UniProtKB/Swiss-Prot annotation:
Protein's UniProt keywords contain Nucleotide-binding: yes
GO MF annotations, alphabetized: ATP binding; ATP hydrolysis activity; ATP-dependent protein folding chaperone; heat shock protein binding; protein folding chaperone
NCBIfam families: PRK00290.1
Region annotation (Disordered) ranges: 613-640
Keyword field: ATP-binding, Nucleotide-binding, Stress response
Entry's family note: Belongs to the heat shock protein 70 family.
Record's protein name: Heat shock protein hsp-1
Gene: hsp-1
A Pfam short name: HSP70
């Protein structure tokens, strides 16, 4: 096993998870709060940046500067209808930057800061990287990061960039359902060929993939899904329902208050989880809005009615992927549930009914399966030779058809959807008019017949074609998809051998090399800020506990009579003065806390050592720098 462990990271819309393959099995790694999944939340305050649990715990107190759902922004345009509808639910501010890219605007340390979705995602990835490093005790460089199978080219590319900004070498971007299939099928060697349907409904995205698994070979037959459907959408329905109820009962509009809305959302999320195991859930929020308490309840039936169309819509991709895989329902051996939202009984019932009452497979942990599979893939790619993974082969597919625009705005597909990747294909095209000097090659992805209905990935010009009648020049266009599902396109004029190529990266509002460099440096800077903040708090806590310890020492029954009243008063006054100073200078610099501590030590040490010489023995507790609640001390926050 190489010294440097490669990890697998499931970068989720709402929660993320990290795993590592070691000693022949996968370890899912718990974070510093002991949780095996970490909220994909980043918060900015007057003093610090928080990532994960700490960020989510303070969201009600700081709704405008707590960013989540970055995965619903990444690789999308600002005017994407999905982005526009999400913005109505987000308390943080999303603005349109150059190239119509969405960015988030927050206030950090009293200044306005603007971040790309890639940067926010990179902060979550950084947290996962640090979680793994704390567990492994070494630095982590290499990672396999997962994306929804239905993510398009720009979303994949942007996710890869986020990894780079976090200082990770992304070995491979793999599809979430495929990763989950590895988790499911890893121990099923020698069971013959099995057709497995992975139904992955998470916090923000939905995928269905059908694979054939046989002796460690995982071949994806088809994939379908919706990159904008998940638990968050079910929460939204419940939030809207209760907002309307509040308006009816109290004639007040909750939507005008982000904090109230956030507290309601947190309660809805909790109620939704309760409804997966009970038939009714109650919501009790004290002083939700203008001092009004909100006590109400919701039944499972009501919740199912609120989300009925969303639940039903999860069945369409299942049928589509069956059609694409040219498979009958009866040929599916196992239906495997992945993602937290598959715990919803109604979703399970719809799926089971679609397969005429077939039992669903719940053998893998729906929250951890994706990170588990990613960790296995990371081990393989970094050359792990252990028996569990050595014969494993992954054959994934391109989720969307890829092609170019030909005369009349027609989409001519070179690579059909569900083609196994990596793949390379070439086709020869010609000019449309006489003596045409160049051709514009426009690359699209999507299933519609006309390019205007599909997604433009990028375009480039092949110029310098020698004059010739239309139809004579031969231009060979080559599409090449790598194992990450990212596309390279080249065009060659056969008569002159002139070539031009692009990795589909430009036009996409994709980050340039310079942008990434700059963001990597900024990420380092923010990390240094976080460290400095930790040291500062450490110095503050150290001073505070030293002052309290000193006071306790001089109050000690055994020592009371060994210390002169004036010495005792000196120390008491100084301690009180310092504790008072601390109260009014919570935000002082580390050096100031250290200076105050030196000051106090200077006064106390001679008195204390005099004391112990007379009493004999070493001083308890109040040794200089008695940092009881030191740098790693817990900070306690109220959670709604």
């Amino acid at each position: 096993m190489s010294k440097h462990n490669a990890v697998g990271i499931d970068l989720g819309t709402t929660y993320s998870c990290v795993g590592v393959f070691m000693h022949g099995k996968v370890e899912i790694i718990a974070n510093d709060q002991g949780n095996r999944t970490t909220p994909s939340y980043v918060a900015f305050t007057d003093t610090e940046r928080l990532i994960g649990d700490a960020a989510k715990n303070q969201v009600a107190m700081n709704p405008h500067n707590t960013v989540f759902d970055a995965k619903r922004l990444i690789g999308r345009k600002f005017d994407d209808p999905a982005v526009q509808s999400d913005m109505k639910h987000w308390p943080f501010k999303v603005i349109s930057a150059e190239g119509a890219k969405p960015k988030v605007q927050v206030e950090y340390k009293g200044e306005n800061k603007i971040f790309t979705p890639e940067e926010i995602s990179s902060m979550v990835l950084l947290k996962m990287k640090e979680t793994a490093e704390a567990f492994l005790g070494t630095t982590v460089k290499d990672a396999v990061v997962t994306v929804p199978a239905y993510f398009n080219d720009s979303q994949r590319q942007a996710t890869k960039d986020a990894g780079a900004i976090a200082g990770l070498n992304v070995l491979r971007i793999i599809n979430e359902p495929t990763a989950a299939a590895i988790a499911y099928g890893l121990d099923k060697k020698g069971h013959g060929e099995r057709n497995v349907l992975i139904f992955d409904l998470g916090g923000g995205t939905f995928d269905v993939s059908i694979l054939t698994i046989e002796d460690g070979i995982f071949e994806v037959k088809s994939t379908a899904g919706d990159t904008h459907l998940g638990g968050e959408d079910f929460d939204n329905r419940m939030v809207n329902h209760f907002c309307a109820e509040f308006k009816r009962k109290h004639k007040k509009d909750l939507a005008s208050n982000p904090r109230a809305l956030r507290r309601l959302r947190t309660a809805c999320e909790r109620a939704k989880r309760t409804l997966s195991s009970s038939s009714q859930a109650s919501i009790e929020i004290d002083s939700l809005f203008e001092g009004i308490d909100f006590y109400t309840n919701i039944t499972r039936a009501r919740f199912e009615e609120l989300c009925a169309d969303l639940f039903r819509s999860t069945m369409d991709p299942v049928e589509k992927s069956l059609r694409d895989a040219k498979m009958d329902k009866s040929q599916v051996h196992d239906i495997v549930l992945v993602g937290g939202s598959t715990r919803i009984p109604k979703v399970q019932k719809l799926l089971s009914d679609l397969f005429s009452g077939k039992e669903l497979n719940k053998s893998i942990n729906p929250d951890e399966a994706v990170a588990y599979g990613a960790a296995v893939q990371a081990a393989i790619l970094s050359g792990d030779k252990s028996e569990a993974v050595q014969d494993l082969l992954l054959l994934d597919v391109a989720p969307l058809s890829l092609g170019i625009e030909t005369a009349g705005g027609v989409m001519t597909a070179l690579i059909k959807r569900n083609t196994t990747i990596p793949t390379k294909t070439a086709q020869t095209f010609t000019t449309y008019s006489d003596n045409q000097p160049g051709v514009l090659i426009q690359v699209y992805e999507g299933e519609r017949a006309m390019t205007k209905d599909n997604n433009l990935l990028g375009k480039f010009e092949l110029s310098g074609i020698p004059p010739a009648p239309r139809g004579v020049p031969q231009i060979e266009v080559t599409f090449d998809i790598d194992a990450n599902g990212i596309l390279n396109v080249s065009a060659t004029d056969k008569s002159t051998g002139k070539q031009n190529k692009i990795t589909i990266t430009n036009d996409k509002g994709r980050l340039s090399k310079d942008d990434i460099e700059r963001m990597v440096n900024e990420a380092e800077k923010y990390k240094a800020d976080d460290e400095a903040q930790k040291d500062r708090i450490g110095a503050k806590n150290g001073l505070e506990s030293y002052a309290f310890n000193l006071k306790q020492t001089i109050e000690d029954e055994k020592l009371k009579d060994k210390i002169s009243p004036e010495d005792k008063k000196k120390i008491e006054d100084k301690c009180d003065e310092i504790l008072k100073w601390l109260d009014s200078n919570q935000t002082a610099e580390k050096e100031e806390f250290e200076h105050q501590q030196k000051d106090l030590e200077g006064l106390a040490n001679p008195i204390i050592s005099k004391l112990y010489q007379s009493a004999g023995g070493a001083p308890p507790g109040a040794a200089p720098g008695g940092a009881a609640g030191g740098a790693g001390g817990p900070t306690i926050e109220e959670v709604d």
